[in-house]
Design a protein with these regions (language model features):
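C-terminal catalytic lobe of FAD-dependent flavoproteins
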Residues: 293-384
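Dinucleotide-binding Rossmann-like beta1-alpha1 core, especially the glycine-rich loop
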Residues: 50-128, 252-253
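Helical element adjacent to the flavin cofactor pocket in flavoenzyme catalytic cores
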Residues: 142-191, 195-198
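Central helical "cap/lid" subdomain
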Residues: 193-242
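Beta1/beta-strand and adjacent pyrophosphate-binding region of the FAD-binding site
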Residues: 2-16, 33
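Active-site lid/adjacent beta-loop-alpha segment flanking the redox-cofactor pocket in flavoenzymes
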Residues: 218-221, 234-331
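Helix-loop-beta segment of a Rossmann-like dinucleotide-binding subdomain
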Residues: 82-93, 106-107, 113, 119-122, ...
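Glycine-rich FAD pyrophosphate-binding loop
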Residues: 25-46
Length: 384
């Protein structure tokens, strides 16, 4: 066996690439290299996420992958992280009288897996979050099971674990070409070097279709969507540290405590080309207006603004599995289209990717939550 040929090259060192690489390397049975185009891992979507662990957020398979992740997040392996991955937060969905039907549907869905989700009236809403204008927001429900996620800690845990298991991360390593011959992929990098591997894992985030095109794969129809966010000061005299995340019934805004401030967003999803995305002033202004309209908060000037990309295929589920182009590419594997759910479900989808990549049976933790690999296969995107 040629020792210069790796088992797996993972392209992309965001949460998807880091978690899958760790899963592949964790028992020491495979050689794994992660290639990251940027000078640091997690620069794009992962590093800009306002992640919340919420089991009834996203389409059904995302919810299943999220539920399958909880036990790992609550009790990771010894030494995986230096601080807890999850911290108590809770979530509060709020709505006007006209949004009762939306809240009814969301509450019913939440109860399927979060029996603690409870409906609240105006007085109860205001008791939880005193800044709410309960003349307008008259209905809602709370789920105390939602958690804040230490995104950086989780991401670094996967990368540290990868290195401890003999894997390697190489930054400033842009892929320029991909070619397969005799069951081996040759990956040409921008610095003129080459890497050879039996399998390429496409975890390139918003650039996953572009990487697929370099390999000759049919596109999965990935659409990156910009979401803007901002932080702002908590009003004098208010203690917001214990507030839940507040989300409007129509997902027109959200805000939550964040490191001594409040973090807000218009929850926009604007289709854009893959890029180092920046916030639009109109997005931020819209978010501020929507939050101020239904609260007593006055956001005179955000302390920080940013934007991130959330990438989707048509049905909103992820694309995880072997290439299924009309002429499939052997050894080319997709881990893409995480949408806005790639942090909360990272352990689940990376475990699924490991099972598929290594030809293992579906892990019992995934099966128990109703994960169905065929519903996540790129085949549904590449073949229509």
């Amino acid at each position: 066996m040629d020792s210069s040929i790796l088992d797996f090259v993972v392209v992309g060192a965001g949460m998807a690439g880091a978690s899958v690489a760790w899963q592949l390397a964790r028992d020491g049975g495979a050689s794994v290299l992660v290639l990251e185009r940027e000078s640091q891992p997690g620069y794009h979507s992962t590093g800009r996420s306002a992640a919340l662990y919420e089991e009834h957020y996203g389409p059904l398979q995302v919810q299943a992958l999220t539920r399958a992740s909880r036990a790992f997040y609550e009790q990771p392996p010894q030494g995986f992280v230096q601080a807890p991955i999850l911290a108590p937060r809770g979530v509060l969905y709020v709505g006007t009288a006209a949004q009762k039907d939306l809240l009814d549907a969301a509450h019913a869905e939440a109860l399927l897996h979060s029996p603690q989700a409870r409906r609240l009236g105006p007085d109860e809403l205001k008791a939880l979050v005193p800044c709410l204008n309960t003349t307008l927001l008259v209905d809602g429900f709370a789920d105390d099971g939602a958690r804040d996620i230490d995104v950086h800690g989780l991401h670094q845990g996967f990368l540290r674990g990868l290195r401890q298991c003999g894997g390697e991360l190489r930054c400033s390593a842009e892929v320029r070409a991909l070619a397969q011959d005799g069951g081996v992929w040759t990956v040409d990098l921008a610095d003129g070097s080459q890497v050879r591997a039996r399998c390429v894992v496409n975890a390139a985030g918003a650039w996953a279709d572009a990487l697929g095109a370099l390999a000759g794969a049919a596109p999965i129809g990935l659409v990156p969507k910009r979401r803007s966010a901002f932080t702002f000061a908590v009003p004098d005299g208010m203690d917001a540290g214990h507030w839940p995340a507040v989300i409007s019934a129509d997902e027109g805004f959200y805000f939550k405590p964040d490191a001594g401030q409040l973090l807000g967003s218009p929850a926009n999803a604007d289709p854009v080309a893959p890029q180092d995305v920046a916030p639009e002033e109109l997005d931020v202004a819209t978010g501020i207006w929507r939050i101020e309209e239904v609260t007593t908060l006055q956001i005179r000037r955000p302390s920080h603004t940013w934007a991130g990309l959330r990438s989707f295929v048509a049905d909103g589920e992820m694309a995880i599995g072997w290439d299924a182009s009309p002429v499939p590419l052997p050894g080319f594997f997709w881990v893409a289209a995480q949408g806005g759910y790639g942090i909360q479900s990272a352990f689940g989808y990376s475990l699924l990717a490991r099972n598929l990549l290594r030809g293992e049976p579906l892990d019992a933790r995934l099966a128990a939550q109703g994960v169905q690999p065929e519903r996540l296969s790129p085949a549904r995107c590449q073949r229509g």
